[in-house]
Amino acid sequence: MLKYNLKISSRFEHIHDGIASILKNDVPPEAEPIYMDRNTVYRLAINNTPIVIKSFQVPNLIDSYMQTVIGKSKSHLSYLNAKRLQKLGFRTPAPVAYGEVLNGNRLLRSYFMTEFIRGGDLRGWENNPDNEPLLRAFAAEMAKMHEAGILHRDFSQHPVYRHAGSRVQLLPHRP
């Protein structure tokens, strides 16, 4: 029998039904894929509220056990990390929700959702004529994180967002 775990931030309770539908029915076809690799990231508007959905890869049996019986799922940890980053004053998209679909103790699917923010990731940063201010902003943000006791473990191009100029935001999936 399937079990659904869903935690929604109070600020986003108005889209509860749409989020619950994702958990029960998977990401809807109208969601726009914006990043596809091991995990898939989608953009979707629910009741005119734009959100980002990270659909985590289905874990193997051992990882599933580790994420449900011994520890927390990646979606749950992402949600907690986002809350922690915000509490410490770091710029990160507001966490909307996390959800898990389980069959007994086996994790079948998990999702982490944040507010949608406009910007771009760091792909192609080396060809950007404004890359020095961007790199300085990135380094300053990392230094602040390290001073706060946070070691960000995912420096691939996707989890670091840049905005016009040199403002940097971190996606909270793996600090």
Mark where each language-model region is.
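Short alpha-helical scaffold element within the canonical Hanks-type protein kinase domain
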Residues: 131-135
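Juxta-kinase regulatory segment immediately upstream of eukaryotic protein kinase catalytic domains
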Residues: 1-31
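Active-site flanking residues adjacent to catalytic metal/cofactor-binding acidic residues
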Residues: 53, 153, 173
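Active-site catalytic-loop/activation-segment of kinase and kinase-like phosphoryl-transfer enzymes
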Residues: 115-122, 169-173
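Catalytic-loop of the protein kinase fold
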Residues: 150-157
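Conserved ATP-binding subdomain of kinase catalytic cores across diverse folds
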Residues: 20-120, 137-143, 147-148
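AlphaC helix of the protein kinase catalytic domain
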Residues: 121-130
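Catalytic activation segment of kinase domains across protein kinase-like and atypical kinase folds
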Residues: 158-175
